[in-house]
Amino acid sequence: MFVKCSCIWYNKNMEKNMFNINNNELSYGRGYVYSLQYHLVWCTKYRKKVLKDGIDAECKEMLCDLAEEYKFQILAMEVMPDHIHLLVDCRPQFYISDMIKIMKGNIARQMFLAHPELKKELWGGHLWNPSYCAVTVSDRSREQVCSYIEGKKEKQ
């Protein structure tokens, strides 16, 4: 038999502490409850330091626009000269690989249009390295990840 407790379903035989989730941090969909946060990192091609001198601010603005359009939240963000750190909260309908593809593709297209000089520095026509890092974030590690991301720019 299942019992509903604080918007989380669990079997009576399970311990209540097993679901140590703050209800304020849960998101609700039609028929489901979720909390999905990822720490995402991706680098420029050849680790070239091209995300600087105002381009970093444009990149942040583009990421915020994409978050609004695709309905995910950016909890923390830092654009470094050669890579990007994001902490995102997203819906379960999106594959994280698709989200990253959308972000990298849209930003590259807009950056190359606005800054044609980037193509000269990044021969081959690619702004981003094809790889990325995506790590799930728990309630316990979220504060550490936020502090890490926010502290990246200060260390430069």
Give residue ranges: language-model regions:
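Basic nucleic-acid-binding interfaces
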Residues: 1-156
